[in-house]
Amino acid sequence: MSSEVLDMLRNDEHYYGEYGRQFLSNSDIGALLNNPRQFHERKPETKPLIEGRFFHTALLEPNKLGEFMIVNCASRNTNIYKDAVAQSGQEILLLKNEADELLSLTQTMKQNLRFFESIYAPGNEYEKPGIQTIKGLQWKGKADIVMHSEGVLIDIKTSGRIDDFKWSARKYNYDSQCYLYQMIFGMPLVFYVIEKETHRLGIYTPSEDFLRSGELKVEQAVEVYNKYFSPESEDSIRNYYIEEVL
């Protein structure tokens, strides 16, 4: 694994930008399985995406919070917000009340002994990139936390309803994430989850069945990629269609 490649992938602009597109990632699974026409299409910035980045940064790399522009206004319909967006050149910015709530979530995690001791254990690495050849293709991943003392990866998630997390995890392809990250980093992945409204906390450890489900998704995604997008492909995405029996 080239150290130069990993150094490039540490930078989010490279990881999520043109350089990083030479590798597949778990975020490609959804498009390849559900709508291959959207594979590698640029995804617009959304409120959940920027909230997720802010939350992770506040918890794991608080020294980088200054990179976020926060707007102190009541809503996105105000001229203050519209002017700030125009000046920033970004598609969407966080409101101060949204940032405050996200910071509150991080405080809840830090105040829980188990969460604090795991997230900030001595020797932990944060936002660590990795690449690996899996099923014949190059995949990338970026681990939130590598907890060397326990030999596990920790992935931080927020949830609208933590009671549903066990069931929604497959819907959001967390099963394929677990499989890919275990292959890339050589460690199992565990989810540390906080419910947005109530701040309830949960720890979710993948089962063998969950990992197998993820591996099957990766195999299916690789099949679609090889059919339509690989350099050796003799088919075109224009020929893609869905066929089902009603």
Language-model region placement:
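Coil-to-beta-strand transition motifs
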Residues: 136-140, 147-151, 187, 198-199
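Substrate-binding/catalytic groove segments of enzymes
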Residues: 65-67, 153, 187-192
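Conserved catalytic cores of phosphodiester-cleaving nucleases, focusing on short active-site segments
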Residues: 141-165, 181
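Short histidine-centered catalytic/ligand-binding loop motif
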Residues: 43-44, 90-94, 163-172, 207-210
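Short, structured patches in soluble enzyme cores that scaffold and shape functional sites
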Residues: 128-130, 157-158, 193
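Metal-dependent nuclease catalytic regions and adjoining charged, substrate-binding loops involved
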Residues: 167-168, 180-246
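Short, well-structured alpha-helical interface segments that form or flank functional binding sites
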Residues: 50, 140, 173-176, 180, ...
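Metal-dependent nuclease catalytic cores that hydrolyze phosphodiester bonds in DNA/RNA
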Residues: 1-140, 242-245
